Structures are given as structure tokens and as C-alpha cells.
Amino acid sequence: MKINFQNMCSLRKISCGLIFSMAISLVACDSDNDEEGGDNGDDGLVEDTSIPGNSIVTVKQNRNIILHNPLSGWVLYAGIGDGLSSTFWQDYDNFPSSEGTVKVSDYANTLYLRGAWADFNPEEGKYAWNSDCDTPSAKRLKMLIEGAKQRNMKLAFTFVVDSRDKHYNFTPNFVKEADAKGYETQTGSVKVWSPYPDDPIFQKYYEKFIRALAKDFNDPDKVQFVSGSGFGKWGEYHSVWYYQVRELGKPELPTREAVFDWVTDLYSQVFDKVPVFVNYHRWIGTSKEWDGNNYDKDTERLIGKAVAKGYSLRHDAFGMKTYYSTWERNFIAKWKYLVPVVMEGGWVKNSHGNSIQGDGYANYAEVRQGEFDEAKTACVNMMDLRYNSDFHNGEAYSWFNEAFQLVKQFCTEGSYRLFPDRISLPTTISNGKQIEIAHRWNNFGWGYCPTNIPQWKNKYKVAFALLDTKNDKPKYVFVDGEPEACDWVKGTAKSYMFTTRVEGVGAGKYMWAVGIVDTTKQNEIGIHLAVKNNVTSAGWLKLFEVTAR
């Protein structure tokens, strides 16, 4: 397959609709009534009077198809502690819903593993994902990783170090035994130990663990994202206690900022191919658990520092009106379409029970609707299906049985849903001659495709292919270096003119096709389009036949 990467070609970006102006009646492809993809092909071609030798093909979106694209869709939760069901995959492959049994991986394309650092790193230099580690947690991890692979799901991680509210130490015992400074708290009848994150011994071992993790998991083929902190209660980066502050009485901000800088530097440096996320809430890194409508004045600045290093944003209390309120809404509105957002609901049916009534919810169907509405306002790319060992009282069960329509609605309206509604291409091409391709792109999801994050820089690009008419495989690929999918947001179409030279193309008939390719993988399709008809098994959208001379 010959590749023509056209970064330096003569390109001109022009305003939406100009290149497609014509005195004919066409279907409005940005209508909200469009459903199934139309038949793209010679019968639907219209001569392009503005580009001699070109014809225009129109494409309809498909609103019903579930797309499993990078950093999009539902996230299925799991852990590797003792509470994990021994029949996890069997349970989720035969999952009860309000409409019958479903396979959850048909809806979710990410498996999120949130757990104790101690479970992933039980001994110094020994890691649960390696073959030489055979602890019960390691066996569960390997089972989950293999099951995710079989279901074409990618992984995501959060590693919690704080043992407060836990029934065992979440930081490995060898860290404590190395004289790292920490503190003890009581969880029921159990006394647990947590490290101070400003302690240099803790930092040495934690950094060693994260670097070992990145060695095997800084791989976008395996991993969807990593949460790049895990400090404080529940790993959400609030209620953080520091040695310099709690034991020595020093001001909090200098220590807090030094720890924040250290950990965000660490993750952003070692995970340069996989997106990393930091929580956004009004008390990032402070010792406060909460304080009503008050907020910390340095939080927004610190989160901004993380974003500047390549971090994206997540929040873990969507739908909780105390913890996701005016400050959080105003904050995330400033980052709309600038960084991707991942959501997690806050209410836990099994433990919170009727406490939801304090937020005005009558039942958990209303909770799910509240989470969904906040997620839509925040333009999130990913939503959560949390795990609970009490299966029928878990959040995943609640979504599929009390709000299944919202599960499906997010699949077809949330994240990003990209497609080109009109493309103008030449009907004949000749070697040594320039061609012009005009194309217009839309996004009908409420999120965005974050090609602007550094981990994805120049990774996903629009490409046009000449397919072999016998097997639909690309023979020649032309990559347009100009369009950025991050610019495509709902309600605004973007138009481009791509000029390139044809070289080395064998004479004969081919099929024009379009797709969004992964340039790091020899221009294989990297993002699937929101279309259905005339799509090859590899993901190319076939357009019409072209003759090469």
C-alpha cells in the first residue's frame, strides 16, 4: 500500500458550505431526523460545477449504530480485591436488563480497574500483571485483562493509596516497613495505615511502581486512559493529609503544590501515548473534605497546570448536588471542547439508600436521570457502569434496569459521532496530476474527539483511499494533514479543500473511500464513522468508483 502523507501540500480551509454551493435540491444531512445511512454510490452522484471533473456524493449519518471509538462510550468498572465476583465475565455477558438479557460489552468498550496500590504491587519489584506474581489479586487481574481483550475492550486504571474508610492497607506494607511517614485511622474494628504523599520514601516507591506500570501499559492498543493521581480519600484528591502540614504545622499550599507538581509531572512524562486524567472539584489536594459552597482559590490554577502538561478532566460525584454544583459546572464550562471529560456518578445505591431524597430524588431512576443530565451539560465523553458485589443493588444493574433508555441514548447521542455529509472527488485521476477533494465534516455527539491532547498529536487524520474493487483493501492512501477532528462540534460543520498530486497509481478502476486513520499504525482506520451502509470490514466508507489513467 502506497502512502502519500500530505502535510506540506497546498491546502486551503474554506468556510462551511462554500465548496458545495449548487442550484440543486439536496437532503439536509444535518437534520435531526436523519436515521439510517444512505446508499453512497454512483447513482447518487451530482456533478460539482465548482471543481471541474469532480462529483459530489452525499452521506447520511446513522444515529442507531453503537460506536466503540477511543475515549468514548460507557466504562465498565471492576477491581481486583476480594469483593470481585468469580463469575464476573459470565455475569456481564448475560446481564439482566429491563428489555431482557444483554451483553454489557456491546455497550461498554472500556474496563476500568480501580483498586489498591497494594493489590497491584504486593512486594517490592513484584507486579500483579507479571507472570511471576500469583496472588489472588494478580489472578483476578489477569482474568480481567484477558476477558477485556476477548471482548475488544481497552483498560483504564486508578490506583488508590489512602486506606481511610478501607478495611486493609491500600499502600504496600513494604513502603511502611521502609520507614515512610504515615498515619493510622480506624475503619470499624480495623486499624489501617496511610502514607503522607509528601514523604520522600513514599514518593520513591510510588514512582517506581508508576514507571513499571507505564513500561507495560503506556500502550493505546491496551489502555484507554489512566487517572493520574489517586491520592486522598477514595483516590479523588480531596481530604489529603501532608506530613509537613499535619505533623510540623507548616502552611499547606507550598507542600500541596509541590506534591501536585511531582505527581502530575510523573504521570504526564511516563504516559505520553495514553491519556491521563485529574479530578476536578473545588478542593483539589487540600485537607478539606468539603465546606459547603466555599472553594479553594488555588484549585483552578493547579488544575490548569495539570492540563498544560497534557492532563484531561474527570469528576467522581455527578448527580450529587452538594459535590457537583455551581463551582464544578462553571469550571468545566471553561474547558468545553478543550479537553475530554470523563464522568462518574456519586450516589451508591447499596450504601446511600434513601439519602438521595436529600437531593430531591424520589428513586434511583431519577438519580440516573440526574447523572445523565449533568453529564450532557458537561459534554462528557465517557460515563460509568460501576461494580458492586451486591449485584442487584449495583449501579450497573440500576442503569440497565431503571434507566436502560438512557444507556442507549448515551450510546447514540453522547461522546463524539463523526461523519462527512458531503464529499467532492474526481471521477478520473492521472499520474503526475493534481487533484482537489472538498469534504465537509460533522459531529452529532455532545462530546468532542480530542485530537488536540498531546497523547494524540497527529495521530488521527482524515484520509482518502483508493480501494481494490475486488477485496475492498486500500491500495493507495492520501492523508489530509489539515483537518483536526477536535474542531468538529455539534451544530457546526467544517469544510476543507485538500489538494494533492497523484503519483505511482496503477491504471484501472478503484473505489474511492474515506475514513479517519491512525497514522501510527500504517494508516489503519482509527476512528469509526457514524455511518452504516457501504462500510468495509476495516472501517472505510466506500463512496464511488474512480478510473486511474
Range-by-range predicted roles:
Residues K2-I3, M22-S55:
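Bacterial Sec-dependent N-terminal signal peptides
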Residues T412-R549:
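Extracellular/luminal regions of secreted and cell-surface proteins that mediate adhesion/ECM remodeling
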Residues R164-G188, H238-K250, G292-T299:
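Aromatic- and acidic-residue-enriched segments that line the glycan-binding/catalytic groove
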Residues M1-L11:
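N-terminal secretory signal peptides that target proteins for export/translocation
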Residues G100-T185, R256-P275:
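Aromatic-lined substrate-binding rim segments of carbohydrate-active enzymes
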Residues R368-L425:
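Catalytic cores of secreted or luminal carbohydrate-active enzymes
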Residues D48-F95, K149, G228-G235, W241-H392:
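Catalytic-core regions of glycoside hydrolase
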Residues G182-F202, Y206-E247:
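Active-site groove signature of glycoside hydrolases
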